[in-house]
Amino acid sequence: MPRKGNIAKRDVLADPVYNSKLVTKLINHLMIDGKKAKASSILYDAFGIIQDKTGKEPVEVFEEAMNNVMPVLEVKARRIGGSNYQIPVEVRPERRTTLGLRWLVSYARLRNEHTMDERLANEIMDAANNTGSAVKKREDVHRMAEANRAFAHYRF
């Protein structure tokens, strides 16, 4: 934590092709070793696959997938009286999008399709249909929060 007050958040620029800040954030999460051009070409190829398979606008499918992946609740560990409790807390909006993007990309990387653009496209389409590993992760996080609802009065 900084000693000299809060640091101002840097705002990402909207994507030049789809004019969406969420798409830019997804490109930044896809990027490895600063290779942004490679990450954006992977994403645009994935969006092309989504367009071909669904016939819908790929950004709309992606936003629907993000709504199905972003968590509302999560648990945080807190030590009280010598034992650790998992306390359910609401997720801030910025953290919701970050977690959703992180889960989408990480579970897309674990898939078995041949190229990364196929993996990403299929993971986004699965998430839009409320299936897939990223949605399962969200359900697991919500299940943990629900199971520990008894400790909700230990606020952070």
Curated annotation (Swiss-Prot):
The UniProt entry's GO CC annotations, sorted and at most eight, read: small ribosomal subunit
Gene3D superfamilies this protein is in?
Answer: Ribosomal protein S7 domain
Q: Which domain of life is it from?
A: Bacteria
Any GO MF annotation of the entry: structural constituent of ribosome
Any single Pfam family the record assigns to this protein: Ribosomal_S7
Q: Which CDD domains match?
A: uS7_Bacteria
Q: What are the UniProt keywords, alphabetically? A: Ribonucleoprotein, Ribosomal protein, RNA-binding, rRNA-binding, tRNA-binding
How does this chain assemble?
Answer: Part of the 30S ribosomal subunit. Contacts proteins S9 and S11.
PANTHER family on file: RIBOSOMAL PROTEIN S7
Protein name according to UniProt: Small ribosomal subunit protein uS7
Q: Which organism is it from?
A: Lactobacillus johnsonii (strain CNCM I-12250 / La1 / NCC 533)
Upper classification of the source organism reads: Bacteria, Bacillati, Bacillota, Bacilli, Lactobacillales
What gene codes for this chain? rpsG
